[in-house]
């Protein structure tokens, strides 16, 4: 063996020893597989199944694609109260048109949604908190039967969450969900108000402009989003009352079912608010109900552009057994967008078979018929103002 090879050996040996030692001293867990999926087949009284604005009137019988999220995570280190976990997720979507659908076209896509490390117990001043970095679904708030994420600042980022702070827990994060828009997210949660729990949050978003963008006069005004959510346990379920107020790039999402992401279509002179009341309750042994009501207002003084909307929807379920139920989903939406009216309503009936009696039990297979009507326009195939859809869909999460 030459001296050169000896030097290589001595350089590699300590690394190999360290890796081997770590394998024997770290208690790593098994890989966890989590995910979400929906898929099916449908048609309408005028060709293919036609779907529109499910965030306004409901998603049951109003989803025309195959969509899935596949998540892998593993705790790689667990010692002395300190843990490190890595998580990665891919999502994919296809048009549900046929057998072979390559995920490389404009309509069929695959995306990296999560890739992060979460470390707990490593902060001396807050051992209960989690330190994290990477792409992450971050503390998302959603209404399931609408597929509406009304508070969501997910994306690449870093932060600390779950710091014990008086009556609640404090979290802070830096994320980016849109281009060069940096978001600072601050939340204080778990504040007890009688039997209810209050969470408040403030999001600050500001573009990070290049010199060329500055020279071109691009706007970089600070946008703010304030959110308050009061959660109350009722009727073997819960009710949530949400208030949101946004300015600048956070104003426009208040009128179009946006979440916590900055909207570049409006970057100065705007303000808006949104009220949401939603929940899932169990009024009797065989009946469960998911419901939502929303009202939003948007104003743009610079552009003299004002709009408002309201939406109401409900999905009651009657359980015939622990594994079979009947759904009725109804939804109504109306808006006035700077003098232009829009209106949409939907009614869906479905027979479903689920893996258990709970409203949240999945997997589930459902057969549905859905009628959607546009009261002001003709958005459907052939210039029609309404459509009747039929189909079968599965939904699962694990």
UniProtKB/Swiss-Prot annotation:
Any one GO molecular function term: maltodextrin transmembrane transporter activity
Biological process according to GO: monoatomic ion transport
Record-marked site positions (Greasy slide, important in sugar transport): 36, 67, 238, 360, 397
Gene Ontology cellular-component terms listed: cell outer membrane; pore complex
Reaction catalyzed: beta-maltose(in) = beta-maltose(out)
InterPro entries associated with the record: G_neg_Bact_CarbUptk_Porin, Maltoporin, Porin_LamB, Porin_LamB_sf
This protein's record includes keyword Cell wall biogenesis/degradation: no
UniProt signal peptide: 1-30
Subcellular localization, as worded in the UniProt entry: Cell outer membrane
Coiled coil: none
Principal cellular location given in the protein's record: membrane
Expression induction or repression: By maltose.
UniProt keyword list: Cell outer membrane, Ion transport, Membrane, Porin, Signal, Sugar transport, Transmembrane, Transmembrane beta strand, Transport
Topology with respect to the bilayer: Multi-pass membrane protein
Transmembrane segments: none
Pfam families linked: LamB (PF02264)
Role description: Involved in the transport of maltose and maltodextrins.
Sequence similarity: Belongs to the porin LamB (TC 1.B.3) family.
Known partners and oligomeric status: Homotrimer formed of three 18-stranded antiparallel beta-barrels, containing three independent channels.
Protein name per its UniProtKB record: Maltoporin
Species name: Hahella chejuensis (strain KCTC 2396)
Source taxonomy: Bacteria, Pseudomonadati, Pseudomonadota, Gammaproteobacteria, Oceanospirillales
